[in-house]
UniProtKB/Swiss-Prot annotation:
Protein's name in the database: Argininosuccinate synthase
Gene3D superfamilies in the cross-refs: 1.10.287.400, Argininosuccinate synthetase, chain A, domain 2, HUPs
Enzyme class, UniProt record, top EC level: ligase
Catalytic activity field: L-citrulline + L-aspartate + ATP = 2-(N(omega)-L-arginino)succinate + AMP + diphosphate + H(+)
Pathway in which the depicted protein is active: Amino-acid biosynthesis; L-arginine biosynthesis; L-arginine from L-ornithine and carbamoyl phosphate: step 2/3
Family: Belongs to the argininosuccinate synthase family. Type 2 subfamily.
Gene Ontology molecular function terms on file: argininosuccinate synthase activity; ATP binding; protein homodimerization activity
Quaternary structure and partners: Homotetramer.
Entry keyword set: Amino-acid biosynthesis, Arginine biosynthesis, ATP-binding, Cytoplasm, Ligase, Nucleotide-binding
Location(s) in or outside the cell: Cytoplasm
Species for this entry: Polaromonas sp. (strain JS666 / ATCC BAA-500)
Gene: argG
Sites where the protein binds L-aspartate: T131, N135, D136
Length: 446
């Protein structure tokens, strides 16, 4: 049986991930008129630009849905977001500024929870608004089939009949107006936005051109910190972690992770923290460009990484970061629940995050400009007395100890010099020209 349907399955239940926007509204009504039985499912992901979630299912019913459900995905999204933070599952960075994979995290939650809700209604055909050029078509495909092995996929934007009849936003708006819904297109923006409570993604249209910078974006989770007229005051923030879990902000304890993330968003958003401009490789290897917001995750990640570096040794940190980059790619590719991702994630949560207990105080300024003011943890292995430049009693090692340690280094120094001489004689290194120690040109080996 074909997994992907190229034509509308008339007379059958078809689930649609319904946002209430023009595209999914027109698609739902069109499917109804063509004889399908559309079921609408809307994910509440805490989108910062969504004013009224309850209105969305009501719209779906007006447009012809047999049933419309609002699925609260916020707790699951918060849990997955913290898991990503604990494992450092972020592989896209530019000059140290991070993209926190907020859209891939949202897709992992949406793809599994909506398809699970569809199964409850005996709906085994799923459609959504992703296009064939993007990442989401593959992410939703994977998560959908992982959740329901009997799932078949119908996407209006892969159906030539739909494209011929409603191929653009103007056509879809006219279609809805003629149907009596008086649907008005929103003002055309210079870019497209997708968001959840973890972060926002701005891309496409004018942002496809690299000479259009971040300044054309109107942030939805924080301030436009680059504008001189926007007042941004310095602010000190204290973040507390217990066994890898963020639990308090400025001394206020949160038992609900969703509420903590929302408060972190408010704090970070006042400064424009966590905004980044990234060029990335999509799953199909073509490059795309996005402007991202993630004020809350950025704040939490600053504190988390500070504690990680103060608590764990160098090899553990190296493994955490290497595995985090691998895990970030898997998350981006729609493989967050694959065995190899679970292995990497749970390793970090068990052996890195569980030791992360403490408080970090940060001074936030404009954008990603901040200073760490204090770090406190019962688990710190940072011991200033070990390396103090002042005279201390009961020093952990003496000058004689260091002489012995340095003398042992002679073994590998000699071996390294021999190897460099071999490379020089073989013509792999040019003696004295900066590629190797200049004194090798006087080496007497023949």
């Amino acid at each position: 049986m074909a997994t992907i349907l190229q034509n509308l399955p008339a007379g059958q239940k078809v689930g649609i991930a319904f946002s209430g926007g023009l595209d999914t509204s027109a698609a739902l009504h069109w499917m109804k008129l063509k004889g399908a039985l559309p079921y609408a499912y809307t994910a509440n992901l805490g989108q910062p630009d969504e004013p009224d979630y309850d209105e969305i299912p009501r719209k779906a019913l007006q447009y012809g849905a047999e049933k419309a459900r609002l699925i609260d995905c916020r707790s699951q999204l918060a849990a997955e977001g913290i898991a990503a933070l604990q494992s450092g599952a972020f592989h896209i960075t530019t000059a140290g500024v991070t993209y926190f994979n907020t859209t891939p995290l949202g897709r992992a939650v949406t793809g599994t929870m909506l398809v699970s809700a569809m199964k409850d209604d005996d709906v085994n055909i799923w459609g959504d608004g992703s296009t064939f050029k993007g990442n989401d078509i593959e992410r939703f495909y994977r998560y959908g089939l992982l959740t329901n092995p009997n799932l078949r996929i119908y996407k209006p934007w892969l159906d030539q009949l739909f494209i011929d009849e409603l191929g653009g936003r103007a056509e879809m708006s006219a279609f809805m107006t003629q149907a009596g819904f008086g649907y008005k297109m929103s003002a055309e923006k210079a870019y497209s936005t997708d968001s959840n409570m973890l972060g926002a993604t701005h891309e496409a249209k004018d942002l496809e051109h690299l000479n259009s910078g971040m300044k054309i974006v109107n942030p939805i989770m924080g301030v436009a910190f680059w504008k001189d007229e926007v007042e941004v005051k310095r602010e000190e923030v204290t973040v507390r972690f217990e066994e890898g879990q963020p639990v308090a902000l400025n001394g206020k304890t949160f038992s609900n992770t969703v509420e903590l993330i929302l408060e972190a968003n408010r704090i970070g958003g006042r400064h424009g923290l966590g905004m980044s401009d990234q060029i990335e490789n999509r799953i199909i290897e073509a490059k795309s460009r996005g402007i991202y917001e993630a004020p809350g995750l950025a704040l939490l990640f600053i504190a988390y990484e500070r504690l990680v570096t103060g608590i764990h040794n160098e090899d553990t940190i190296e493994q955490y970061r290497d595995n985090g980059r691998r895990l970030g790619r898997l998350l981006y590719q729609g493989r967050w629940f694959d065995p190899q991702a679970i292995m990497l994630r749970e390793t970090a949560q068990r052996w890195v995050a569980r030791a992360v207990t403490g408080e970090v105080t940060v001074e936030l300024r404009r954008g990603n400009d901040y200073s760490i003011l204090n770090t406190v943890s019962p688990n710190l292995t940072y011991k200033p007395e070990r390396l103090s430049m002042e005279k201390v009693e009961d020093a952990p090692f003496s000058p004689l100890d260091r002489i012995g340690q340095l003398t042992m280094r002679n073994l590998d120094i000699v071996d390294t010099r021999d190897k460099l001489a071999i490379y020089t004689q073989a013509g792999l290194l040019s003696a004295g020209q900066g590629a190797s120690p200049p004194q090798l040109k006087n080496d007497e080996r023949k």
